[in-house]
Curated annotation (Swiss-Prot):
Alphabetical list of Pfam families matching this protein: Sod_Cu
Protein name: Superoxide dismutase [Cu-Zn]
Organism: Candida albicans
Residues that coordinate or bind Cu cation: 47, 49, 64, 121
Lineage: Eukaryota, Fungi, Dikarya, Ascomycota, Saccharomycotina
Cofactor binding: number and manner: Binds 1 copper ion per subunit.
Gene3D superfamilies assigned to the protein according to its UniProt record, in alphabetical order: Superoxide dismutase, copper/zinc binding domain
């Protein structure tokens, strides 16, 4: 079992933690999160980005992690970036809390997400179907108010 965590924060009030667990390279990765400070009753884009560089804030994290050269899509789509985790849903207090499993996200192997950045976006991910200029690359999810580098944990 490999476990990882990202402490998410930024220039806004958005903050929290994201945990990852994977039993083996062929097993799905379980992702769980608790993030506060978002707008209430909202959907917020949630993506793993290429770099673990936050020297210039969350913009230094680069584009979505996309080792297979695909277009942006929904988590359940065949055509998607590895880093496309879709949206997280906030409650009436602006807290997003949940768990999901994903077969493309790896903690083990050459396409590992370790050392990369998880980003909470300011807008809703349109899953590449919104018709905006950036829909097929970013899901038109907007600014990056909070992020954290994914690192090993016990």
């Amino acid at each position: 079992m490999v476990k990882a965590v990202a402490v998410v924060r930024g220039d806004s009030k958005v903050q929290g933690t994201v945990h990852f667990e994977q039993e083996s390279e062929s097993a799905p990765t379980t992702i769980s999160w608790e993030i506060e400070g978002n707008d209430p009753n909202a959907l917020r884009g949630f993506h793993i980005h290429q770099f673990g560089d936050n020297t210039n804030g969350c913009t230094s994290a680069g584009p979505h992690f996309n080792p297979f050269g695909k277009q942006h899509g929904a988590p359940e789509d065949d055509e998607r970036h590895v880093g496309d985790l879709g949206n997280i849903s906030t409650d009436g207090n602006g807290v997003a809390k949940g768990t999901k499993q994903d077969l493309l996200i790896k903690l083990i192997g050459k396409d590992s997400i370790l050392g990369r950045t998880i980003v909470v976006h300011a807008g809703t991910d349109d899953y590449g179907k919104g018709g905006f200029e950036d829909s097929k690359t970013t899901g038109h999810a907007g600014a990056r108010p909070a992020c954290g580098v994914i690192g090993l944990t016990q």
